[in-house]
C-alpha cells in the first residue's frame, strides 16, 4: 500500500489486515500507552479545512508510535496565500517528513498529493469525496461493537449527498458478503448516483425518506453539512429534518454511530444509552490511525 487515498484503492484483505493491526495497536494502548515503531519519524499534517477529531487523533497516533508531528491548520500562515500550488507544497513537505496526512476542500486533492509526494500520503478528507481513515475506524467499530461485518444490516441517515464518510463506508461494505443498507435522506441529499452505481448489485440497497430502523444492526447518523451548500437557504430547508431520540431507539439491539461533529441530529439524551457508541467510535480513531501509519511506513521502506 503506497498511499491511502480512496477505499476503491484497497481490497478486502488489505482492510482486514488493517483491522487486525488496529487490534494490536489498541492492545498496546491499553497495556503501555505507547510504543517506538515510528521513533524518529515525522508525520506532516496539512489541514486546509477545519478538523478536531481527525487531526488530533492523527497527531496522537503518531506520538503514541514514538514519532513527531509537523504541519499547519491555518493556510493564512502558509505560502498558499502567495499562490503556491498544492503540487509544489507537497513536493517540498514530502522532503521534510516520512508521512503526510492531508485534508483539503477540493475533490481529488489527496490523489494529486500522492502523485507529487516522495512519501506515503493519507487522505484525511477531500471535499465531499472520500475519507478512508474514517471508514476504516468505522469498520473497526462495527467489528468490535457488533461482532461482524459480513451479513451486516445498516441504516445511513441524513446527508448522504455530501457525506464523504458515507460514500467511503458504502464502498468498503460492498466488499463483504450479505450486507444490507438502508439509505434514509431528504430528496435534496440523496446518495450520489455514481456511488449507488458503484455498489449496486454487490449489496442489498433500499432508499427512503422516513426513518426506519427496525431490524438493523447499526444506525449511522450524519450531520447536515452547512458548509457544503452553495445556497444557505437550501440548507435551512433540510436542517434538523432528522433527529434521533430515545423514543426511536427504545430497547432495540442496535449500535448507534456518528462520525461527529453532531449538531442536532442526535438528542443528547441518547448519549447515556447503551446503544450509543459514537464517542467510543471516535476513540477507535487512535489505534486505527496508528495501524495505518505503521503499515504505510513499513511498506514505504521495503
From Swiss-Prot:
Catalytic activity: carbamoyl phosphate + L-aspartate = N-carbamoyl-L-aspartate + phosphate + H(+)
Record-linked PROSITE patterns: CARBAMOYLTRANSFERASE
Pathway: Pyrimidine metabolism; UMP biosynthesis via de novo pathway; (S)-dihydroorotate from bicarbonate: step 2/3
A molecular-function term among this protein's GO annotations: aspartate carbamoyltransferase activity
Pfam families: OTCace, OTCace_N
Residues where carbamoyl phosphate binds: 53-54, 103, 131, 134, 260-261
The EC number(s) this enzyme carries: 2.1.3.2
GO biological process: 'de novo' pyrimidine nucleobase biosynthetic process; 'de novo' UMP biosynthetic process; amino acid metabolic process
Superkingdom of source: Archaea
Swiss-Prot/TrEMBL keywords: Pyrimidine biosynthesis, Transferase
InterPro entries in alphabetical order: Asp/Orn_carbamoyltranf_P-bd, Asp/Orn_carbamoylTrfase, Asp/Orn_carbamoylTrfase_sf, Asp_carbamoyltransf, Asp_carbamoyltransf_Asp/Orn-bd
Binding site for L-aspartate: 82, 164, 223
NCBIfam families linked: asp_carb_tr (TIGR00670), PRK00856.1 (NF002032)
Its biological purpose: Catalyzes the condensation of carbamoyl phosphate and aspartate to form carbamoyl aspartate and inorganic phosphate, the committed step in the de novo pyrimidine nucleotide biosynthesis pathway.
Family: Belongs to the aspartate/ornithine carbamoyltransferase superfamily. ATCase family.
Subunit structure: Heterooligomer of catalytic and regulatory chains.
Name under which the protein is recorded: Aspartate carbamoyltransferase catalytic subunit
The organism's taxonomic lineage, starting at the top: Archaea, Methanobacteriati, Methanobacteriota, Methanomada group, Methanococci
Gene name of the encoded protein: pyrB
